Every structure is written in structure tokens, then in C-alpha cells.
């Protein structure tokens, strides 16, 4: 083992001994980051700090729409449900995917009336129409 490896192992050992790892909830940090970045793709402007206040303290972000905040809350709850479901090592089913979809869209979903019929994204209904990316985007 060379000196760099020894120094690296020494630093790692001191880090573990410091207990920092026990002071930071990395799973929670990862979840909040995942939710923040996932909803940003959908247009949310809520920051990780604002989500932390919303999720941990129930403090809403000033100047952010209720729709944005509910999108973040719903996605967090859906992720937690999905993590719990994965621990049980259950099979994927259409019913499970519909339930998960309903959790994601719980407060922000809407009813649609299209050529193929009617469906409600807040209920986890399967889409009866094409999906496009932006105005005029291809399906």
C-alpha cells in the first residue's frame, strides 16, 4: 500500500470516527433533492431549502403557487410509497402503477375528455390520448 492509499484510509477512518455520517440523514437529503429536481423538470421553481421547510416544518414557500407546492408534496409521498413497496419485493402490476400514478397526481391531476373517452389523472387512470412535449411537440 502506498502513502496516498494510507493517507486516504486514515482520512476515511477519521471521518467515520467523527460521527458526521450519523448527523446527516442522507436518505432524506437524497429524497428531497430527487423531488426538487424531478419537479423542476415539470416547471416547479421550489428550491431544496424551500422543500425542506415544506416537508419538515409545514412552512410554505412565499411567492410559490399552491400547485407547485402540492406537486412536490405528492411526489415526495409517492416516492416514499414506492421505496416502501420496493422493500417488499412485490411484482409490478398495472394496478400498482395506477396507484402510484394517482399518488403523484393526487392534488395536481385533472379530468380529461378526449376522442378516446374520459380519464382522470388524479385517480391514476390510464391515458386515453397521446402525450406531447411542449406546444406542438411530437407524440
Where in this protein do the model-derived segments appear?
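FIC/Doc superfamily catalytic core
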Residues: 1-139
